[in-house]
Every structure is written in structure tokens, then in C-alpha cells.
């Protein structure tokens, strides 16, 4: 047999065998790796430590001690989470929304990231004017910004991804966010709901620039103008965008329910996507509730009639927010 013909046959055969063996080796090594967990992080701001039926106060021996306010609420899902997992009774958040969110995203407290109040418009403070009390000159009115952000340049708006020019006159901290770190580890990252990391028309207003692959309804706003779908979730600066194409307006879907449905749709799409199905996911689930305004969901109206104690649903413990009879 012609030696050149043998070589011509053997070389592609050996190359193919080597590639198959290499692919099998990679597949085997991946199979041997410990399976990374999916992560769903729920964040609720403006919620007091007693605004749930799960008690956080403990006796000296560690026994849970329900308070009067704990007895006003029925939150069975939180009770289930408390029984199945760990309850931290000495962990504290910031007393206002933006600083807490910026801390969770960055791993820094407000003394380091310099965000000490809620944010909205670029370079504009939300502090009330006072003759004696002055805000620190270097606190970040623009919130946190993604790593690599410059004082001026071009950025993408959240949701529409339209490009705009921006310029920040005030100081701002740069952050390599948690989703960016998880993305580097092979996670598919999803943001759903309230973002409120950076001021309007800054890079920090766009969750995708912090490392999220997908962004559902997250912008610079901290609270919705309205929770009702029939009101199109409000208008003006506090309108919740990105939910107007799924019959939520027509069906008067409560905002909390709409966001939950959108998150489930995204998880289902990931499961069906061959490029993402085998990857772990990180879902940052941040409903706008219980932030103002106080609105009762249609599905919960009338519950007060069948409960022995006063009960509130969307915001705060005051009686004016209770479910109407």
C-alpha cells in the first residue's frame, strides 16, 4: 500500500481521536466538579424587623419572642424560610434604600461607598435643606458606579440600551459588583425589580453595567408611581418601565405579581436555552414593594375580615395602610 495514502488516512484519524479524547476529558472534568448552586437573593427595603410574623427578637436563651407587631402580620413564606435556613438577629441594614442596596452590591458600608441618602437625579442631592445640618461635601449623590466609570462619557440607558452622553460633577465610588464576580464564575445573572444603585443618566442606573446579563424593570427609580397595572404603574420620574408589552396594563396586574411572572419567564427561558441550561443562575429578586405608595393588591382585599388581628400588606405598620374592610 502506498505509504503516503496510509499517512493521509492516519493523520486525520489520529487528530479526530485526539479531539474526541480531549472533549471527553473536558466533559469528564466538568462532571467531576462540584455542582454550583443556583442563587436567588430577595431584597426588601423599607421593612421593619417586626413587620413580619417571623420573630427576630430572642430571649437570652435564644428562644424566639414574638412582639405585638409580629402578631399583626401573616408571612408564612418568611416563616418557612426561617425554619429551613438561618435567621440572623444581629445583622443591620441602612435605614434608607439606596445606601442598603449600594452596600449589598459593593460589600462596603456607607462610610466607605459614601452613599448616605436615596438617589434620583444626576448631581442633585435629595437632602432637605437645613441651616445647621449640612451633608458631607464628598458624599455621593450619584450613588455607586460600575468599575471603570469616568466622570464623563457615553453610557447605555437601562432597558432601552439607548446611548447617551453624561457628565458627573460630583464624586462617585466605582464598584466591581457581586453579579460581575458571579458572571466570571460562569453564572447567568438576572436582575428583576428595583435597582436604585445610581442616579438617572449615569452608568450606575443600568444594572447590566454591574454585570447582570438580564435586567427586568430596573432603573434609577426607588419606588413606583403606582402599583396598579390599570394605572400603567404610574407616570413621570417614577414610572416603572419595561412591563408594558405583556398585558399587565390590560389585566390590571399588581406590580409585585408582574415582576414575579417576568422572573419566572426568564428562568424558564434560561432552562430552555442550550447555552445557559447547564449554567448556574443568580437571580437578584427585588420587588418594589414595600416601598411607598401604599397600595392594596386586589387578591388580598377583604382578608382583614377573617383575621383576628389588624393586618397590613404593602407598606408600614400604621393603621392607615391597613387592608380596607
Where in the sequence are the language-model features?
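Bacterial N-terminal signal peptides that target proteins for export
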Residues: 1-9
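A short acidic, glycine-rich active-site loop
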Residues: 63-71, 163-171, 315-325
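Short, structured active-site-proximal loop/turn typified by the sulfatase FGly-forming signature C/S-X-P-X-R
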Residues: 59-101, 107-112, 188-190, 213-219
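Active-site-proximal N-terminal segment of extracellular/periplasmic enzymes that hydrolyze or transfer
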Residues: 26-86, 195
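Bacterial N-terminal signal peptides
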Residues: 8-18
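A long, amphipathic alpha-helix that forms part
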Residues: 51, 258-271, 309-325
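Formylglycine-dependent
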Residues: 120-188, 195-296
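Aromatic- and acidic-residue-enriched segments that line the glycan-binding/catalytic groove
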Residues: 58-63, 101-110, 201-217, 221, ...
Amino acid at each position: 500500500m502506498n505509504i503516503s495514502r496510509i499517512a493521509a488516512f492516519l493523520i486525520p484519524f489520529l487528530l479526530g481521536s485526539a479531539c474526541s479524547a480531549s472533549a471527553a476529558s473536558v466533559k469528564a472534568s466538568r462532571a467531576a466538579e462540584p455542582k454550583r448552586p443556583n442563587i436567588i437573593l430577595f431584597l426588601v427595603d423599607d421593612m421593619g424587623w417586626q413587620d413580619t410574623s417571623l420573630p427576630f427578637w430572642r430571649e437570652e436563651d435564644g428562644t424566639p419572642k414574638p412582639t405585638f407587631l409580629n402578631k399583626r402580620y401573616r408571612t408564612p413564606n418568611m416563616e418557612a424560610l426561617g425554619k429551613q435556613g438561618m435567621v440572623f438577629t444581629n445583622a443591620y441594614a441602612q435605614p434608607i434604600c439606596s445606601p442598603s442596596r449600594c452596600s449589598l452590591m459593593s460589600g462596603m458600608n456607607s462610610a466607605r461607598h459614601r452613599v448616605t441618602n436615596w438617589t434620583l437625579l444626576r448631581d442633585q442631592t435629595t437632602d432637605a435643606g437645613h441651616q445647621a445640618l449640612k451633608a458631607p461635601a464628598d458624599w455621593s449623590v450619584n450613588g455607586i458606579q460600575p468599575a471603570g466609570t469616568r466622570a464623563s462619557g457615553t453610557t447605555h440607558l437601562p432597558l432601552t440600551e439607548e446611548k447617551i452622553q453624561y457628565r458627573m460633577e460630583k464624586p462617585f465610588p466605582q464598584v466591581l459588583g457581586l453579579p460581575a464576580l458571579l458572571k466570571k464564575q460562569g453564572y447567568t445573572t438576572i436582575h428583576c425589580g428595583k435597582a436604585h444603585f445610581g442616579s438617572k443618566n449615569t452608568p450606575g442606573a443600568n444594572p447590566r453595567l454591574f454585570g447582570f446579563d438580564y435586567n427586568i424593570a430596573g432603573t434609577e427609580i426607588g419606588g413606583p408611581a403606582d402599583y396598579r397595572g390599570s394605572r400603567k404603574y404610574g407616570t413621570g420620574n417614577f414610572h416603572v418601565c419595561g412591563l408594558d408589552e405583556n398585558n399587565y396594563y390590560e389585566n390590571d396586574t399588581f406590580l409585585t405579581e408582574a415582576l414575579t411572572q417576568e422572573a419566572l419567564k426568564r428562568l424558564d427561558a434560561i432552562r430552555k436555552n442550550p447555552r445557559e441550561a447547564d449554567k448556574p443562575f443568580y437571580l437578584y429578586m427585588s420587588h418594589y414593594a414595600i416601598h411607598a405608595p401604599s397600595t392594596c393588591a386586589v387578591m388580598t382585599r377583604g382578608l382583614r375580615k377573617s383575621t383576628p388581628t389588624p393586618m397590613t400588606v404593602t407598606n408600614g405598620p400604621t393603621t392607615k395602610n391597613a387592608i380596607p374592610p
